[in-house]
Amino acid sequence: MSLKEKTQSLFANAFGYPATHTIQAPGRVNLIGEHTDYNDGFVLPCAIDYQTVISCAPRDDRKVRVMAADYENQLDEFSLDAPIVAHENYQWANYVRGVVKHLQLRNNSFGGVDMVISGNVPQGAGLSSSASLEVAVGTVLQQLYHLPLDGAQIALNGQEAENQFVGCNCGIMDQLISALGKKDHALLIDCRSLGTKAVSMPKGVAVVIINSNFKRTLVGSEYNTRREQCETGARFFQQPALRDVTIEEFNAVAHELDPIVAKRVRHILTENARTVEAASALEQGDLKRMGELMAESHASMRDDFEITVPQIDTLVEIVKAVIGDKGGVRMTGGGFGGCIVALFPEELVPAVQQAVAEQYEAKTGIKETFYVCKPSQGAGQC
C-alpha cells in the first residue's frame, strides 16, 4: 500500500469522512557543498523519492487535529485561537505546531484542518525527515486555504519553526530543496540570496545513499566549533561571511591565521568553488569531472575540515574502487558519521552493493543501509 493510500484510508477511518487533498514533500541528499550554507555559500542538493505524505481536509472551525500514522496513530489536537505551545509528550507534534504557529505570524487567513501524516524518509540518517515534515505541513495549509505563499516562503517558515519552536539550529537548504526540488534535476542554491538554479541530471545515473550506521556523538558540539572557526576566519578578513573571501586573498595571508582556522577557511573557499563547478559538470553530463570534484570535496572534509570518521572513509574507498572515474562518491551531511552519497551509472549498482556488503561490515563491524534514489519533485499534491 502506498503512503497516499495508507493516509487516505486512515483519515476516513479516524475522522469519519474522506480527505479532500493529499500532499507530499520529499527528503533530500546534498551532492556537494558541505558546511557552506551558514557561510552564505553554495550547495547542490536534490530531492529524493522518500517523502512525508499528508492526507488532509479543511474544517469549518478553528481546530487542528493531527494523527501520526508512524507513531502508533497518536493524535494531537489544538486550537488556532489559543496560544500554540509545545506538546509535553509528542516531539513529532512540535514540528506541526511550530509550522502552524509561524504560519499564523505570516498569514493568519486560514482555518482549522484535519491531517493524517505518514512518511518513509529514514530518520536520523541526515536525509532531512524533519524538513520534509515542515514543508509538507506548510504546503497543506497553503493548498487548502489558497495562501499567497511560494515555495521559498514555505521553506523559510519551516526553518523558523525548527530554529525557534523546536529549538534545533539548521540552515535553509533542507527546507528549500524539499519545497522547490525538480524531478530529474539537482538544485544549485545560493544560500545568501536564496536564488536557485535547476541543474539537469544525466540520464541513467543512480543517486545512491549509503548510511554508515556509525552512531554520531560529536556532531552537535563539533558543528558549533566549526561555525565559530568560520566566523573567526571571516572576521580576520573583515568580511560578513567567508563567501566574500577569494582563494587568492586567503593564500596571500594564510600563514598569519591560526593553523586550524586556516584549514577550516580553506575548506569553505575551495568547497564553494567546487560546488559551482559541479553544477556545470553535471549539466554537461561530465561524470568524470563530477567524480573528481566529489573526491576533492571528501578529501577536504577529511583533512581540512576534519569531520569524517574512519568508517565513512572506508565506505568511500570501497565505492570508489568499483566506480573508478565513471562517477563520484563523498560523505554528505554534517559529519562524524551519517551517510555517503554516490553518483554513477545505474548498471553499476549491483556491483557497488555487493562490494559494500562484502567489505564494509568485515572492516568496521557495522552493517550499512543502502538506498537507491531518484531525483524527485518538490512539495505538492500527490
From Swiss-Prot:
Q: What is the name of this protein? A: Galactokinase
- Binding sites annotated in the UniProt record for ATP: G124, A125, G126, L127, S128, S129, S130
Pfam families from the entry? GalKase_gal_bdg, GHMP_kinases_C, GHMP_kinases_N
Keywords of the record, alphabetical order, are: ATP-binding, Carbohydrate metabolism, Cytoplasm, Galactose metabolism, Kinase, Magnesium, Metal-binding, Nucleotide-binding, Transferase
Marked site, Transition state stabilizer, at: R28
Q: Where does Mg(2+) bind?
A: S130, E162
Q: Which domain of life is it from?
A: Bacteria
Q: What class of enzyme is it?
A: transferase
InterPro entries under this entry?
Galactokinase, Galactokinase_bac, Galactokinase_CS, GalKase_N, GHMP_kinase_C_dom, GHMP_kinase_C_sf, GHMP_kinase_N_dom, GHMP_knse_ATP-bd_CS
Q: Which organism is it from?
A: Escherichia coli O6:H1 (strain CFT073 / ATCC 700928 / UPEC)
Tell me the route in metabolism or biology where this protein functions.
Carbohydrate metabolism; galactose metabolism
Function, in words:
Catalyzes the transfer of the gamma-phosphate of ATP to D-galactose to form alpha-D-galactose-1-phosphate (Gal-1-P).
The UniProt entry, under SUPFAM superfamilies, shows: GHMP Kinase, C-terminal domain (SSF55060), Ribosomal protein S5 domain 2-like (SSF54211)
> According to its UniProt record, where is this protein located?
Cytoplasm
Similarity comment text for this entry: Belongs to the GHMP kinase family. GalK subfamily.
